[in-house]
Structures are given as structure tokens and as C-alpha cells.
Amino acid sequence: MADKNNKEKQFSRRDFLKTTGVATGGIIGGSMLGGLVGFNLDSPTEEAGTSGESADQGSEGAGSGDYNPGRIFFHNDATFDTISQAMERIYPEDDMGPGAIALGAPFFLDMQLAGEYGNNTREYMQGPFYEGEPTQGYQSRLIRSELFRLGIERLDTEANEMFDDNFRNLDGEQMDEILTRFQEGEADMGVPADTAKPQDFFRLLRSATIEGVYADPLYRGNLNMEGWKMKNFPGHQHAYIQEIDTDSFTEINPQPLFGGDH
């Protein structure tokens, strides 16, 4: 009887440590460990587990497809669908392979904006602010998450002014026309130029899209490593000893940082 009670206590303690370890790791590790937990756990509460998520979090937006690990930064479907459609226009699906949405790039961006990338307050973000050179990179006084929120809002503003509808409801050519206006600096950001420029938003959007397509699946993009497969990129191989010793061409299946296929 005593042995049984001891076993129950041991199991309870182990379960407690597992639970608190995951929770504490999510807090200490920030968005990285939060992403790991959200990516690997397949529980019913996965999508509702982030603070502040609204009831529409679990619904299927146009940008989610069948892949939905849960969102951290984007709290409603409309905003997420808008940025998803913009990313799809930058990296569209074609006969060569899937596009940004199917590859999970919008979820990659969601995770990045919820972490230090989006909250880049330590990157010399205090004034005075001067006009930067093109070679100096990102110069806005807004942190990246703020610039993305503003940019998404202005996508809809431009869409309604030009086509009397929200951006996510437009056809591909209309979306391209609006994105081109941002790329060329013609769109109105609704704020002074020294606060944010449309081309700044477009550059970040384009970079985030490409990164989401080709990043390690650990970061929620490059779903099933399809981005790597299109490039025949081997990913993170432990060694190439066997391949070095052979005279024939060897096809190597890509490997992620952790585990097998994601």
C-alpha cells in the first residue's frame, strides 16, 4: 500500500514538473519556446492558448488553409487574411510548387512579430531620427510590429479608395497594383514620411515572405520543407561522410533542425 502511494506521488510530481516546465519555458524562452510548444503539441486547446485571442481564432480564414498551429500576434481573421493574401501575391503558387500560404509563411510572420523581431525596441529606437541612406536598412521610428499593423490598415485603405472593397477580397491583378504602389512609394501611409514610408513596409513584407518560405520549419514556415524541396536544399544534415565517398550523384532528403518531417 505504501509503495502504491509512493508511485502515485512520484507520477504526480513528474506530471507537475512537466506541466510547469512547459509553462515556465514559454515565459522565459519568449516566442521561440512558445512557437515550439505550439508547433509540436497537438491538443484541443492549442489555438486558444494564447493570451488575448478572440473567438474567431479557431475559424478557418482565407489565409490559413488546412495548416493552423494557432496565432500569437494576429488576433482576428480579417487582419491575418489580409497579410496572408499580400504574402501570397509576393510568392504565389504556380506549377513549380506551393505559394506562401500553403507553405505557412503567414504563420512564420505571426510568430516573428510576436517576438523580438516585431518588438525591436533595442535597435537604436530612440531619437533624434534622421533620414537614412538606402544602404542603412530599416530606419522607421516605429517598431516592426507597429509598421506591419499600419501597413495592413493602409492596404485596406488603398483597396477601398481604388476598388471600393477590402484588400483581401480583390483579385490578383488588383492586389498587385496596390502592392506596386507600396513598393514604389506611391501609397499613402497616413503618417509623416519620417515616421513610416510605404516602401519600408513593402520591403519588410517581401523579406518576411521569403524568409517564411525558406526558414526551418521550427519557425512555422516552410511547411513539410516544401520550400527546401523546390530548391533541392538538404537542410541540416548531420554529416556527408557517405556522400563524399561515392562517385555517383546522391539525392538527399532535407532534414530540419529537430526531428523528421514537420
What are these regions (language model features)?
Residues N40-A55:
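Ser/Thr/Pro/Gly-rich low-complexity linker/stalk segments immediately outside membranes or between
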Residues F16-G38, D171:
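N-terminal export signals
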Residues R13-R14, K18, R206:
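Basic side chains
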Residues A2-K4, D66-R71, A78-Q85, R89, ...:
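Mature-region segments of soluble proteins
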Residues M1-F11, D15:
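N-terminal secretory signal peptides
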